[in-house]
Amino acid sequence: MTNHQKRLSVPKSWPVERKTETFTAKAGAGPHGESGVPLVVVLRDVLEYVDDTSEAQYAINTDGVLVNGDSVGDVNRPIGMFDILAFPDRDEYYRVFPDEGGRLGLTEIDADAAGSKLNKVTDKTTVSGGRTQLNFHDGSNLALDEDAYAGGDSVVVDTDTNEIVAHFQYEEGALVTAVAGQHAGDIGEIAEINVQPGSASNTVRVDDENGGFETIAEYVVVIDENFVEEDDE
């Protein structure tokens, strides 16, 4: 199996130029599915901290870069929405956030903010012992004793303790950002949630400073004011 794929075939979310070199790295197994960007692409093409895969491998072998507070074993580890990248030697920290057009970008944050990660609850299941398991947008999950969360909610998880430190409900009036579709990167408040019959996708109407927009409910993630303030810095 090849470790490269043609640049013209990569997902639109990848922050790479499609008309330069023919091939780019292929994301390995891991979170975020097909939308995940290989870590080496972020280090080489976005941040320009390394020149090649060998330098990227050295960086992860020496814990020069951490993802969500953890060491990384594979330069092709997929990086995706809301992941936290930390560069301890540089004292630099970034959150992965979609820009206008849906491509993944990096927002610089401080060390305190880098200690936790925002997760969208896609659904929940009951596991052994009657515990509730929250399933998140990146494929990760968290088992809890309490059942206080719903699909569409967002939770902030401490990367050291794996405990939920904040909870934002998916409801009218909630602050959201669109992470896909033509409004990706836009931020506003949910004005209306429209539940569609059958298999049709639910939609939301969002009010923002540009007059608002309507999009598929799956495309929005609930955030809070602190999140916006950090991204504006």
UniProtKB/Swiss-Prot annotation:
Family: Belongs to the eukaryotic ribosomal protein eS4 family.
GO MF entries: RNA binding; rRNA binding; structural constituent of ribosome
InterPro entries: Rib_uL2_dom2, Ribosomal_eS4, Ribosomal_eS4_central_region, Ribosomal_eS4_central_sf, Ribosomal_eS4_KOW, Ribosomal_eS4_N, Ribosomal_eS4_N_CS, S4_RNA-bd_sf
Domain of life: Archaea
Biological processes per GO annotation: translation
PROSITE patterns per the UniProt record, alphabetical: RIBOSOMAL_S4E, S4
Coiled coil, from the record: none
Gene behind this protein: rps4e
HAMAP family cross-referenced by the UniProt entry: Ribosomal_eS4
Protein name: Small ribosomal subunit protein eS4
CC per GO annotation: cytosolic small ribosomal subunit
Nucleotide-binding as UniProt keyword: no
Ranges where the S4 RNA-binding domain occurs: 37-99
Entry keywords, A to Z: Ribonucleoprotein, Ribosomal protein, RNA-binding, rRNA-binding
PANTHER family: 30S/40S RIBOSOMAL PROTEIN S4, SMALL RIBOSOMAL SUBUNIT PROTEIN ES4
